[in-house]
């Protein structure tokens, strides 16, 4: 007999978040692992996508005793279809990707022509600016109250486990699609050009590659993936609040990429599942092992210590990550010289 409460808990607290963070990790891996672009504002793109997705799936709420209200566009879809939430979910996800991609484009255009550290500074600033802008845009985002009661595309009433499992499966299907597309792209000549830029941009320039445009493409696509994942995350939590998108989130995503294996699309998915399970385990450890109230708060610090120890162990024993990037060497080196 399957424990439905366990299915509900695993789907909501581990599997679905792991799939969502895997999408973010794939986006960051495209930027950093394949192209060498340092993005310190992952949480900013993620938060922008979360709010765009939330706005498209919720009705507008005016100011009142419960808060300043927020913008909502889901009612617009009632004119065309009875499936307003599903359409809002799809349109909101696409809009989240578009807006996050445009923000990434605006940041990348002036900074990618400069030294790499300017991009890091600009994206770091984005993370702070995005959160403060969300917090102070009361009529649109709900301010510090955020956007509440965000619906899911699939609801099964009293069968909570069905609702949670269906959403986890939805996120899993999206991850498979994103992985397939990125895997194909990074194995194509376009992806090999990105790796050439990562290894030696001057050499790529000498071979006639438009390195600026290639870096721009990689950064914008990565930012768009982060925004789309943010929309999924808001629907998972059913709420979007500014405090969910702090620099700690950026650090977590970077840890997933490093632990899994930077430059390996499969590896970063493994890293996302590993780090998300570590968080899930520490959240549930107190109940599983009947720990005393002494661990109520301290268990969260134990998680940070565990992540730190994991990173140190990887640096010492597996610096390339759990699933390292494969290094391919041609079996016919004479091809490079035009002779047999």
PLM segments and residue spans:
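Transmembrane alpha-helices and adjacent helix-loop boundaries
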Residues: 1-340
């Amino acid at each position: 007999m399957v424990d439905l409460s366990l299915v509900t808990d695993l789907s909501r607290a581990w599997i679905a978040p792991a799939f969502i963070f895997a999408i973010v990790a794939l986006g960051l891996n495209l930027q950093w692992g394949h192209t060498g672009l340092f993005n310190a504002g992952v949480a900013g793109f993620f938060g922008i996508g979360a709010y765009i997705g939330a706005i498209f799936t919720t009705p507008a709420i005016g100011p009142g005793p419960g808060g300043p209200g927020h913008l909502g566009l889901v009612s617009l879809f009632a004119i065309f279809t009875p499936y307003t939430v599903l359409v809002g979910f799809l349109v909101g996800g696409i809009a989240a990707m578009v807006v996050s991609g445009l923000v990434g484009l605006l940041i990348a255009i002036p900074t990618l022509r400069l030294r790499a550290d300017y991009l890091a500074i600009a994206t770091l600033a984005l993370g702070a600016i995005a959160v403060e802008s969300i917090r102070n845009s009361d009529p649109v985002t709900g301010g510090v109250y955020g956007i509440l009661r965000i619906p899911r595309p699939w609801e099964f009433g009293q069968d909570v486990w069905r609702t949670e499992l269906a959403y986890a499966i939805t996120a899993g299907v999206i991850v498979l699609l994103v992985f397939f597309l990125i895997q194909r792209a990074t194995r194509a000549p376009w992806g090999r050009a990105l790796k050439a830029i990562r290894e030696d941009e001057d050499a790529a320039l000498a071979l006639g590659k438009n390195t600026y445009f290639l870096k721009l493409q990689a950064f914008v696509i990565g930012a768009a993936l982060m925004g789309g994942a943010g929309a999924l995350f808001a629907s998972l939590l059913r709420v979007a609040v500014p405090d969910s998108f702090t620099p700690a989130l950026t650090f977590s995503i970077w840890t997933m990429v490093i632990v899994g294996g930077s430059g390996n699309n499969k590896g970063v998915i493994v890293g996302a599942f590993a780090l998300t399970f570590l968080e899930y385990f520490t959240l549930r450890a107190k109940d599983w092992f009947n720990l005393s109230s002494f661990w109520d708060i301290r268990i969260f610090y134990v998680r940070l210590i565990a992540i730190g120890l994991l990173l140190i162990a990887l640096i010492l024993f597996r610096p390339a990550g759990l699933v390292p990037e494969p290094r391919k060497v041609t079996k016919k080196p004479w091809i490079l010289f035009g002779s047999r």
